[in-house]
From Swiss-Prot:
Membrane topology category: Multi-pass membrane protein
Alphabetized GO MF terms: antiporter activity; proton transmembrane transporter activity
Protein name in the entry: Potassium/proton antiporter CemA
Cited InterPro entries: CemA
Alphabetical list of Pfam families matching this protein: CemA (PF03040)
GO cellular component: chloroplast inner membrane
Chief location: plastid
Keyword terms, alphabetized: Antiport, Chloroplast, Hydrogen ion transport, Ion transport, Membrane, Plastid, Plastid inner membrane, Potassium, Potassium transport, Transmembrane, Transmembrane helix, Transport
PANTHER family: CHLOROPLAST ENVELOPE MEMBRANE PROTEIN, CHLOROPLAST ENVELOPE MEMBRANE PROTEIN-RELATED
Annotated transmembrane regions: 47-67, 136-156, 184-204, 219-239
Role this protein plays: Contributes to K(+)/H(+) antiport activity by supporting proton efflux to control proton extrusion and homeostasis in chloroplasts in a light-dependent manner to modulate photosynthesis. Prevents excessive induction of non-photochemical quenching (NPQ) under continuous-light conditions. Indirectly promotes efficient inorganic carbon uptake into chloroplasts.
């Protein structure tokens, strides 16, 4: 006889077999649930990446005819005033260009008598101006409606986003402190570091064009010189507050690599 009675060994073996037989389906069920959640989360993320382009194209094609009809039939005083002011400015620029052409080509006509070429150019300027206005208004409506739809889609899919972010957190925390610091430093330098002023210029210029703002180099330069600095300071403070309690060595490595 051994030190442990055979009855106890048989009992433990029976319990182990029963436990494994019960836990097997449970494990498969949990794996199946995790697989379905992962598939739903990936589909949601793919839709979230593709949806803005689809919404923009569909809304633009459906809204532009309405905006064109509204622009051609409406006669609001404010819009007429703005149209008149902008058209006069454009006319002034065209007149300067035409005067320069006259000086070069030595036209025999006097400047006070406009030629058919000048009238045609001014007519084209008016058409281009109206086309630009319709384009800007269409973009405004498209962006606001698209933003509302995407916000609703994000609110409805918070659980799926939470699953995706849990994967990212799990992957991030599974790395070593050196790799964590390297990943954080790479992301900050690419997005808000001193290596990305041109990217910020393109982003701000794209936003201003989509929302109908006039391109202004001074405003863009001031935003590029201040906004990334503020974001960088906030991000460093967040790293210090969050990771100083979880992993102080990560904060030390990050500051050493950043220097």
């Amino acid at each position: 006889m051994g030190l442990i009675p055979h009855s106890i060994i048989r009992t433990l073996s029976r319990l182990r077999t029963e436990f494994m037989s019960k836990s097997g389906p449970l494990v498969f069920y949990e794996m199946e649930v995790a697989k379905k959640r992962a598939s739903a989360s990936l589909r949601y993320l793919t839709c979230l990446l593709v949806l803005p382009w689809v919404i923009s194209i569909l809304l633009q094609k459906s809204i532009e005819p309405w905006v064109t009809f509204w622009w051609n039939t409406s006669s609001f005083d404010i819009l007429d005033f703005l149209e008149e002011e902008n058209t006069l400015v454009i006319f002034g620029q065209i007149e300067e260009l035409l005067l320069f052409e006259r000086m070069i080509e030595n036209y025999s006509e006097t400047y006070s008598k406009p030629s058919s070429k000048e009238i045609k150019k001014k007519t084209n300027v008016i058409k281009l101006y109206k086309k630009d206005c319709i384009h800007i208004i269409t973009h405004l409506f498209t962006n606001f409606i698209g933003f509302a739809l995407l916000s609703t889609y994000l609110v409805m899919g918070q659980k799926k986003l939470a699953i995706f972010f849990s994967w990212i957190r799990e992957f991030f925390y599974s790395m070593s402190d050196t790799m964590k610091a390297f990943s954080i430093l790479l992301a900050t330098d690419l997005c808000i570091g001193f290596h990305s002023p041109h990217g910020w210029e393109l982003l701000i210029d794209w936003i201003s064009e989509n929302y109908g703002f006039v391109h202004n180099d001074r405003i863009i330069s001031s935003l590029v010189s201040t906004f990334p600095v503020i974001l960088d300071t906030i991000f460093k403070y967040w790293i210090f507050r969050r990771f100083n309690r979880i992993s102080p060595s990560l904060v030390v490595i990050y500051h050493s690599m950043n220097e």
